[in-house]
A protein has these predicted regions:
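Mixed-charge interfacial surface used for oligomerization/domain docking
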Residues: 1-5, 61-82, 88-98, 102-195
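N-terminal glycine-rich anion-binding loop in soluble enzyme alpha/beta folds
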Residues: 1-33
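Short catalytic-loop micro-motif centered on adjacent basic/acidic residues
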Residues: 30, 55, 83
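Glycine-rich, highly charged phosphate/nucleotide-binding loops
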Residues: 31-42
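Glycine-rich phosphate/diphosphate-binding loops that line cofactor/substrate pockets in enzymes
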Residues: 40-51, 186-194
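Short, glycine-/small-residue-enriched flexible loop/hinge segments at domain edges that mediate gating
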Residues: 52-61
Length: 195
């Protein structure tokens, strides 16, 4: 939401509309998790069409979304819903969900898919480089002093998720230009990319 104006991600506000408002609205957007009732309705609908449901979420450490889903499952009778923590955010979660979808398409059983998701989340690691900390400061997640120091030293922090799903600093690169190339170099230097 931007102040009093609320939106449902990619439903009532397209991605280009969001970024346009982000650039022009002086109010910083805030997110909120879906309420258990939203999950309950989805689970009831899906239960009427499928034998089992896999619900894959971003970690509890960064959002209460999974907790809302767990609360909703307790209110849905006669369904087989498995709530899974992806231990990843953004692209990492998307890769895990895509892996699960491929397993469904391949005809794997519910238990085989859960096992595959657990394997995928243990082997999925995403790194991102933050060019500008302004939105982190506006959202209250980054102290203003950290942004000032990063700007003065021209440092771009690299973030990742820990093994328990918490967002953490992985490193940093110098400069604000050619971050893609710098990230590739960072990955080659710090991590065995041959696996």
């Amino acid at each position: 939401s931007f102040g009093e104006k609320g939106y449902i991600d990619k439903v009532s506000h397209t991605i280009p509309e969001f970024y346009k408002e982000l650039a022009t609205n002086p109010i910083h957007p805030q997110t909120s998790q879906p309420v258990p009732g939203d999950f309950k309705r989805q689970y009831q609908f899906l239960s009427s069409h499928y034998k089992s449901i896999l619900s894959i979420h971003i970690p509890n450490s960064v959002s209460g979304t999974m907790q809302s889903a767990q609360t909703a499952v307790k209110r849905v009778s006669g369904s087989s819903v498995t709530i899974l923590d992806s231990l990843n955010i953004s692209v990492g979660q998307g890769l895990i969900v895509t892996h699960a979808a491929r397993m469904v398409k391949a005809g794997k059983s519910h238990d085989e898919i859960v096992e595959g998701i657990n394997y995928a989340r243990e082997n999925t690691k995403v790194f991102c480089c933050i060019k500008d900390l302004s939105y982190g400061v506006k959202g209250g997640r980054v102290p203003g002093s950290v942004k000032v120091i990063a700007d003065i030293l021209r440092i771009s922090p690299i973030l990742t998720t820990s093994s328990n799903g918490k967002l953490e600093k992985a490193g940093a690169v110098l400069g604000k230009k050619n971050l893609g190339k710098k990230m590739v170099k960072y990955m080659k230097n710090k991590h065995d990319v041959s696996k």
